[in-house]
Amino acid sequence: MAYLLHAQLFLLTTFILVLNMRLCPVLGHFLGGIEKSSMEEEGASEALNYAVNEYNEKNSDLYLSRVVEVKDVQKQVVAGTKFFFDVILGKTICLKTQGDLTNCPLNEEADQQEHEFCSFVVHDIPWENYIVLLSSSCHSI
């Protein structure tokens, strides 16, 4: 008799677990797996700004680039958060020596409108005040 009770409890527990995973997709994700995110995610905006600043520092262009469009954002919860960004960057009229992108308009001249599709991976550990650009790749579009 005790065996039947244990079997019924096991089946009921399994049923509830499966039901929870179907109704709550977050439980269905693998721990540490890459999942869809958005720019509203805590830390995403800062991570993308960091990636663009690093991009501007390291490229050989005279002018700053800034984000024209965010195509995709994904995240992976590790020790901190890894953000995966796919964005379109556009050249601005601001020289790198100006350094501030806040009031920097895009170059609107037809022959100067250069855009790049870029993928950035940023690892952010806010409680350690640590952020690093792990990878970046860009190509003209």
UniProtKB/Swiss-Prot annotation:
Its GO biological process annotations read:
cell development; cell killing; negative regulation of cell population proliferation; response to axon injury; response to chromate; response to hormone; response to protozoan; response to xenobiotic stimulus
Q: What does this protein do?
A: This protein strongly inhibits papain and ficin, partially inhibits stem bromelain and bovine cathepsin C, but does not inhibit porcine cathepsin B or clostripain. Papain is inhibited non-competitively.
Gene3D superfamilies from the UniProt entry: 3.10.450.10
Which residues, if any, are the signal sequence? Answer: 1-27
From which source organism is this entry? Rattus norvegicus (Rat)
Query: Which is an annotated GO molecular function term of this record?
Result: cysteine-type endopeptidase inhibitor activity
- Name of the protein this chain belongs to: Cystatin-S
Its cellular-component GO annotations read: cytoplasm; extracellular space; secretory granule; vesicle
For the keyword Signal, the answer is yes
Q: Where is the site described as Reactive site found in this chain?
A: G32
| SMART domains per the UniProt record, alphabetical | CY
In terms of InterPro entries, this protein maps to: Cystatin_dom, Cystatin_sf, Prot_inh_cystat_CS
Expression tissues: Found in saliva, tears, urine and seminal fluid.
Subcellular location(s) per record = Secreted
Main subcellular location of this protein, as a coarse class? secreted
Instruction: Family membership, please give it.
Output: Belongs to the cystatin family.
- Give each disulfide bond as a residue pair: C94-C104, C118-C138
User: Which residue numbers does the motif Secondary area of contact cover?
Assistant: 76-80
Its keywords, alphabetically, are: Disulfide bond, Protease inhibitor, Secreted, Signal, Thiol protease inhibitor
